[in-house]
């Protein structure tokens, strides 16, 4: 699909809403000509404010609307530059070429952003307390929690845990401006 339709333009660093055009609708990996109420589908659009699952962070959720119809976006993933909106059609019929309005669940996005930033603060605090050998080995960032997997040769002591917690809390209280920087592996 990416070769035929081109990559999806991501607008989500500056907006939680956008207009878009449906490029394709997929059911079980195959393109279909339409989707109706009750269908579970993947919708590809030309541009989106929905952040796709990446680097341990879950994808955005929200709503897609058109005419007098809507779909609930239950997850967003990405492959080969295409953002895939996993959705359930609530009512109406959706067809490729349809103009739609996209609306990200803003309160959930804010919680995801906070936990994403917290992973960076936690990593730096761990390196300060335990040493430069600490490396991130994985993570899970959701709207309700984060998990941070890291390398260290032994269990942390209560004193080390308290020191890491104090550093992270001090940084949070600083309420520093957050800058978006796209990092490549």
Predicted segments, located by residue:
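A glycine- and charged-residue-rich anion-binding loop/surface
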Residues: 1-185
């Amino acid at each position: 699909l990416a070769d035929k339709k081109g990559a999806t333009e991501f607008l989500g660093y500056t907006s939680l809403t956008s207009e878009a055009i449906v490029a394709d609708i997929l059911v079980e990996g195959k393109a279909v000509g339409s989707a109706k109420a009750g269908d579970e589908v993947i919708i590809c659009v030309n541009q989106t404010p929905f952040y796709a699952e990446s680097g341990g962070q879950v994808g955005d959720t929200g709503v897609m609307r058109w005419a007098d119809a809507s779909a609930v976006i239950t997850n967003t993933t990405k492959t080969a530059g295409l953002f895939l909106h996993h959705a359930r059609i609530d009512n109406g019929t959706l067809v490729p070429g349809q103009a739609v309005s996209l609306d990200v669940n803003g309160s959930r996005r804010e919680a995801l952003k906070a936990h994403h930033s917290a992973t960076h603060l936690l990593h730096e605090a761990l390196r300060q307390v335990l040493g430069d050998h600490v490396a991130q080995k994985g993570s899970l960032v959701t709207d309700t929690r984060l998990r941070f997997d890291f390398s260290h040769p032994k269990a942390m002591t209560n004193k080390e845990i308290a020191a890491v917690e104090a550093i992270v809390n001090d940084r949070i209280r600083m309420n520093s401006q957050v800058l978006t920087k796209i990092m490549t592996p």
